[in-house]
Every structure is written in structure tokens, then in C-alpha cells.
């Protein structure tokens, strides 16, 4: 009697309309789904595809963009092992502690996070929006 975990969208308790974190589960992937709302800096879609599926060859266009504010948004995708996410609200209080298993992904749009590795030899892919301009301009630590 396995309980299937589903996608979680975690909103701020301080600003209830502000989406802070998304947890996407391997079991959530059916067809194409845009996981992160399009107004965010980081983008992710999941695609479940059958053999012989193809896409038209293409390249992406360079754009000249100027933003008033830009934040580094980050994602972890668990390839092997298990990871506990500790997710923070915008006031630095812990808001959720989901467990990621193989094929699951976390997305931090706003708020903070840390991770606890629960199994030896855990492997993750980490994705962040760039460009990276050094730790001083990228993050502040939560006490």
C-alpha cells in the first residue's frame, strides 16, 4: 500500500500569494508540463515521451534584457539516493521539510533552503540561474 507523493507548491505564510518552492515528483511526469510558472527566472518543463519522438532542429535567440531586480533561483534533481530539503519562508522560518527521492526535483524561487543528504553516494544535478557573479552577490546565510 504505497502512498504516491505528489507535486507540492509551497507558498509564503507571510505573503500567501507568493510561491516560494516547488517539489516535483517523478510520479508527476505525464506528457508535457511546465513545472515553474513562466514569470520566473528559472524554467523547467517535464516531458514523458515515447520512442522515435523528435523535435525540429532549433537554436535559441540572444536577448538584451534589463531587470530592475534579479534573484538566483535554484533546482536540485536527485539522480540517485535521498535528500531532505529544509525550505524557508521569506522571514527565514522553516516552512516545509520534504524528502526527495530518485527522479524528484526541488525548485527554490524565493525564500531559503538547505539540504541534508540521507543516503551515501547520493547524486544530484544542481541548476541555478546565472550569470554567477560570486557568493557575495549571490546569497546571504540564514542563522
Regions found by a protein language model. Name each.
Residues 2-51, 143:
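A short, N-terminal "cap"/entry segment at the start of jelly-roll beta-barrel domains
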Residues 9-10, 114-143:
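Double-stranded beta-helix
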Residues 47-70:
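Conserved short histidine dyad/triad with adjacent acidic residue
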Residues 57, 85-86, 106-108, 113-119, ...:
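Short beta-strand His + acidic residue motifs that chelate non-heme Fe in jelly-roll/DSBH
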Residues 70-88:
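Glycine- and acidic-residue-biased ligand/ion/polar-headgroup-sensing regions
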Residues 89-110:
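Short acidic-glycine-tyrosine-enriched beta hairpin
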